[in-house]
Amino acid sequence: MRNQKGVTVWFTGLSGAGKTTVAREVERQLKEKGYYVQRLDGDIVRQHLTRDLGFTKEDRDENIRRNSFVAKLLTQNDIITLCSFISPYRKARQTAREIIGEFIEVYVNAPLEVCEDRDVKGLYAKARAGEIDNFTGISDPYEPPQNPDLELRTDKETVEESASKVIEYLEEKGYINLPEDVLAG
């Protein structure tokens, strides 16, 4: 039996803030310790599960709703689910929390200029040139979490430091390293 309880760790932040990078490192460390982990990443999911959706507010909300449903199924089966989605709107993140239940909101915080510097795809430049509509942080708002469960400052921390904070939080809240008697009951 695994020493873990299902939970969704929801990484939110601007494009380029480091959501996927930190989630991959958390996934690597947890799997190395034998935990069952599944990572849902915005870029990958949009190629498969939500390819019919665009980037209007309504489509973004629907994207989050669908992914919340998948995360809920995984979480209910005691999988540690790492979700990396910009998820720019507070209300949609609150809806995700309500759908999923066991939910940890992680604000991956980096200043816009840092995110732009990290942008290898040139998306920010295209958005600033008017070539991409509804681009979060440029032509569409990002509503930062008001009370995230955890905040990572990826402009001031290494990837390993950020990942360690997430893993320590999971331990503190009793999602990993559970004693056998808790799991049996």
From Swiss-Prot:
SUPFAM superfamilies in the record: P-loop containing nucleoside triphosphate hydrolases
EC number assigned by the record: 2.7.1.25
Segments forming a coiled coil: none
Pathway(s) it belongs to: Sulfur metabolism; hydrogen sulfide biosynthesis; sulfite from sulfate: step 2/3
Residues that, per the record, bind ATP: G13, L14, S15, G16, A17, G18, K19, T20
Record-annotated active site: S87
InterPro entries (UniProt xref): APS_kinase (IPR002891), P-loop_NTPase (IPR027417), Sulf_AdTrans/APS_kinase (IPR050512)
Segments traversing the membrane: none
Annotated keywords: ATP-binding, Kinase, Nucleotide-binding, Phosphoprotein, Transferase
Enzyme type, top EC level: transferase
Reactions listed under catalytic activity: adenosine 5'-phosphosulfate + ATP = 3'-phosphoadenylyl sulfate + ADP + H(+)
GO molecular function, one term: ATP binding
GO biological process: hydrogen sulfide biosynthetic process; sulfate assimilation via adenylyl sulfate reduction; sulfate assimilation, phosphoadenylyl sulfate reduction by phosphoadenylyl-sulfate reductase (thioredoxin)
Cellular component terms per the entry's GO annotation: cytoplasm
Biological role stated in the UniProt entry: Catalyzes the synthesis of activated sulfate.
PANTHER family: SULFATE ADENYLYLTRANSFERASE
Family indicated by similarity: Belongs to the APS kinase family.
The protein, known as: Adenylyl-sulfate kinase
Name of encoding gene: cysC
